[in-house]
Amino acid sequence: MNVLTIQNVIKSFGSKKVLCGLELSVQEHSIFGFIGKNGAGKTTTMKAILGLTKCDSGAIYVMGEKVHFGQTNTNRYIGYLPDVPEFYSYMTTTEYLTFCGNICGMDKADITVRSTELLKLVGLGQEKRRIKGFSRGMKQRLGIAQALLNRPKLLICDEPTSALDPAGRKEILDILLSAKEQTTILFSTHILSDVE
């Protein structure tokens, strides 16, 4: 089954065409690496999938449901990691994930179990410090945990390894590979070796 289907999507900003008839489909429990140079339309595509950018023409479907600009109905299936995730720096990892789970309407017991499971997955299970002391790599890992919290069918990661050193990039890619058992992953990058 296709979790994501994009059909002939066209998007321009003024006279500049960014997406020219984009077609793709992503099957369940797969990892799809979206590669291109800066300005190639990777982030625009991801924002269109989330219903945050209006396409000039074409159609996008998540779990068989059409995505509409400005409506978030299909976002219940999606977890999203932006290229630079933002957090409430005064919180701990557990406080932050509890806050996010409450926003999603998750059951309190489920938030606790899921937070523990995900923090272990991303290597932050023993972390008790406030987020303000985190490195960029630690923030990326917490962002992945947050994006997976509500068990999305599709995890979208916008340049998850950008600005990380080689060891940090490998850690994030290993986490995404582990997360494939739980969800389908679409990630963008301009680094060819990340896709390989």
Name each model-derived stretch.
Residues 144:
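Hydrophobic anchor residue at the start of the ABC signature
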Residues 58-69, 73-74:
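Conserved ABC transporter NBD signature motif
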Residues 37-41:
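Walker A (P-loop) phosphate-binding loop of ABC-type ATPase nucleotide-binding domains
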Residues 98, 102, 109-126:
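Conserved ABC ATPase "signature" region
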Residues 155-158:
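Catalytic Walker B motif of ABC-type/P-loop ATPase nucleotide-binding domains
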Residues 169-182:
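Helical segment within the ABC ATPase nucleotide-binding domain
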